[in-house]
């Protein structure tokens, strides 16, 4: 039986949910409070100079792969154009109702009553079988509670409201916090400000946005199927050594900004166990003295003077808080403080599959769109009755196991409570969906085997089989992508694996069975 489903938000996750649910024939209505699709990428919502920190291959949906023949980091405008093509190709926009804000979603028996408010203020109610929340993380800006901040007389904004660096021309500016957008914003402001200070509580792990495949281990450590499994099976004590191998070539570099990056990476701890900022743009202005970092945090404010925990102080005219966002679902009665309290970070066990949260998982590597797409594929199967959620007890058991795993794996940055390992999470969801790719033998399909094991874990591999497969086009994409690993390494691995299997077969137990 086909369901009537309400989707809240037409951002990257909402678009994925529309596509996967309509693939199963469900009737979908997506309410978007803005006048256009794209969420944070909507026109006028973010600064124009934005470039993605995730490559085109991990920001594109598996059923509409990039047309470029090489790795690229799309600009905001380029990504919006990709989304436009996606919506047009699958006729998705007919399901979106713009300028309509969901003000309340309430469960009544086995139905949901959704109240929406139009741009003119008119309110209407509709009934649905399911509600899918795709409103995203970026709803309620978070700012720290700092002593004396209320007495500061200068300008205070959150990165959510940043549009143009010229607003800070000639001013003494302090940026607080570091993420991908903060690296861009701080760098831009430093070009025009009289002084630009960057306040951080601790040294962050920062990886380059642009990199050569063969030269930078950040590309393969956790995005390759093979290396992900090898690295994550090692004891945590080995991970610092792996990180050292990454930064040692930078700390000895003649290039000052590379040397600074290496020093920060060294001081931040194993990058495998924390959120990583994938944007090194900041290190050039730091090396040039345009950005002055203060590591340790803010003690208090006295008027327009900021006093840091290391005892130093600075006079400033403006503050830009790049300090993230709070979870916010004002239209729901359910209170959610941490997404790790949900089954697969999607479902509230006590509510079941009629309420889903899509796109609230943050992969340490890889992009949110492909994860939201995988979540939506599972949701679509649940809606169609092809799959069903585990028992309440089993869901709670999985929630606890997953939470313990992610808290241990990313213990250096516990405040990023939605962080997951891309490869592990995608595989776990693929098993639920039934689209986990089977690695072929060397005899059956040697080229595909090499690409699956040794190249990044592209979303296309989850279209080789399972519901709504695109076997031929997915295989073509995978086998035509250049090798990340070298052929000598690949051959060495395959020989070692074959030897291991041979030795296992020739074990004493097997020999005894053969003698019988």
UniProtKB/Swiss-Prot annotation:
It holds the Pfam family FMO-like. Its EC number is 1.14.19.55. Its cofactor is FAD. InterPro entries: FAD/NAD-bd_sf (IPR036188), Flavin_mOase (IPR000960), Flavin_mOase-like (IPR020946), FMO-like (IPR050346). Gene3D superfamilies: FAD/NAD(P)-binding domain. FAD binds at residues 13, 32, 40-41, 51, 102, 365. SUPFAM superfamilies: FAD/NAD(P)-binding domain (SSF51905). Keywords: FAD, Flavoprotein, NADP, Oxidoreductase. It catalyses: 2 bromide + 4-hydroxybenzoate + 2 NADPH + 2 O2 + 5 H(+) = 2,4-dibromophenol + CO2 + 2 NADP(+) + 4 H2O; bromide + 4-hydroxybenzoate + NADPH + O2 + 2 H(+) = 3-bromo-4-hydroxybenzoate + NADP(+) + 2 H2O; 3-bromo-4-hydroxybenzoate + bromide + NADPH + O2 + 3 H(+) = 2,4-dibromophenol + CO2 + NADP(+) + 2 H2O; 3,4-dihydroxybenzoate + 2 bromide + 2 NADPH + 2 O2 + 5 H(+) = 3,5-dibromobenzene-1,2-diol + CO2 + 2 NADP(+) + 4 H2O. One of its GO terms (molecular function) is N,N-dimethylaniline monooxygenase activity. The keyword NADP applies. Brominase involved in the biosynthesis of polybrominated aromatic organic compounds. Catalyzes the bromination of 4-hydroxybenzoate (4-HBA) to 3-bromo-4-hydroxybenzoate, followed by bromination and decarboxylation of 3-bromo-4-hydroxybenzoate to 2,4-dibromophenol. Can also use 3,4-dihydroxybenzoate, with lower efficiency, forming 3-bromo-4,5-dihydroxybenzoate and 3,5-dibromobenzene-1,2-diol. Belongs to the FMO family. This is 4-hydroxybenzoate brominase (decarboxylating). It comes from Marinomonas mediterranea (strain ATCC 700492 / JCM 21426 / NBRC 103028 / MMB-1). The lineage of its organism: Bacteria, Pseudomonadati, Pseudomonadota, Gammaproteobacteria, Oceanospirillales. The gene is bmp5.
């Amino acid at each position: 039986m086909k369901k009537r489903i309400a989707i809240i938000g037409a951002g990257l996750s909402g678009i994925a949910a529309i596509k996967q649910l309509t693939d199963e024939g469900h009737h979908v209505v997506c309410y978007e409070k803005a006048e256009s699709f794209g969420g944070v990428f909507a026109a006028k919502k973010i600064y124009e100079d934005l470039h993605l920190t995730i490559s085109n291959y991990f920001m594109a949906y598996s059923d509409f792969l990039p047309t470029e023949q090489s790795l690229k980091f799309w600009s905001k405008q380029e990504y919006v154009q990709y989304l436009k093509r996606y919506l047009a190709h699958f006729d998705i926009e007919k399901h979106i109702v713009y300028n309509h804000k969901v003000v309340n979603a309430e469960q009544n028996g086995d139905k949901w009553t959704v109240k929406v408010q139009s741009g003119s203020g008119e309110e209407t109610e509709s009934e649905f079988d399911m509600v899918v929340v795709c409103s995203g993380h970026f709803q309620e800006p978070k700012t720290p509670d700092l002593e004396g901040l209320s007495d500061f007389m200068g300008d205070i904004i959150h990165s959510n409201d940043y549009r143009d660096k010229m607003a800070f021309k000639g001013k003494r500016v302090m940026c607080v916090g570091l993420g991908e957008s903060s690296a861009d914003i701080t760098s831009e402001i430093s070009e025009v400000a009289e002084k630009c200070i960057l306040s951080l509580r601790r040294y962050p792990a920062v990886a380059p946005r642009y990199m050569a495949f063969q030269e930078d281990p950040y590309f393969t450590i956790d995005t390759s199927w093979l290396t992900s499994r090898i690295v994550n099976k090692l004891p945590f004590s080995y991970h610092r050594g792996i990180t050292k191998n990454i930064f040692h070539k930078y700390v000895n570099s003649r290039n000052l900004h590379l040397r600074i990056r290496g020093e920060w990476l060294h001081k931040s701890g194993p990058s495998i166990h924390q959120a990583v900022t994938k944007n090194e743009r900041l290190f050039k202005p730091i090396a040039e003295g345009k950005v002055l970092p203060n590591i340790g945090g803010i003690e208090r404010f006295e008027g327009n003077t900021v006093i840091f925990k290391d005892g130093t102080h600075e006079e400033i005219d403006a503050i830009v808080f790049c300090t993230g966002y709070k979870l916010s679902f004002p239209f729901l009665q359910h209170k959610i403080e941490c997404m790790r309290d949900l089954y697969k970070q999607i479902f509230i066990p006590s509510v079941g599959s009629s309420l889903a949260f899509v796109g609230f998982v943050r992969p340490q590597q890889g992009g949110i769109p492909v994860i939201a797409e995988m979540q939506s594929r599972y949701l679509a199967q649940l809606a169609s009755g092809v799959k069903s959620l585990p028992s309440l007890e089993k869901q709670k058991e999985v929630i606890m196991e997953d939470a313990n795993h992610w808290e241990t794996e990313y213990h250096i940055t516990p405040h990023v409570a939605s962080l997951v390992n891309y490869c592990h999470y995608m595989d776990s969801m693929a098993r639920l969906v039934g689209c986990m790719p089977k690695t072929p033998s060397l005899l059956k399909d040697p080229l595909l085997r090499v690409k699956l094991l040794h190249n990044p874990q592209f979303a296309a591999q989850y279209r080789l089989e399972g519901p709504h497969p695109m076997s031929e086009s997915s295989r073509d994409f995978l086998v035509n992508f250049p090798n990340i690993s070298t052929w000598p390494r690949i051959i060495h691995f395959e020989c070692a694996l074959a030897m291991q299997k041979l030795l296992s077969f020739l074990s004493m137990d097997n020999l005894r069975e053969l003698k019988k």
